[in-house]
Amino acid sequence: MITVNGPTLTSGSNTVTAMPATTSGVHGISQFGLNLKLNTTATSTTPVGAEVSPAANGTNYRGQAKANYNTVDNFKFTTGDGVADSANGGAGGSDAQIFTVSYIVNVPGSQPAGTYTTTLTYICTPTF
């Protein structure tokens, strides 16, 4: 299981609202979210992100993005959420994979100017 932990973007007391449910980005509203997919040009002028590599294929049971973080052009952020898991019940290894995280940020015109930052920690907990 891989979890993401940390706060949403902040600049002093100003914040960008975390996306509590999986949804697409909407220009002009406060949103901060992430996913583990290769996103299309619906979110930017060029595709952003990547698929988990190598992918699970029903035989190797490698890790994969979890629900809420595995839909193209849809994003979510809740600290403590599991974003990826092998869920193979000990049926085999799931090593040597590359996970790429894509982030989205949208703000309204009324968002106070500033340098918005966050520190996110990804924790991988192995199970045997």
Predicted regions and their residues:
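Signature of Gram-negative chaperone-usher
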Residues: 1-128
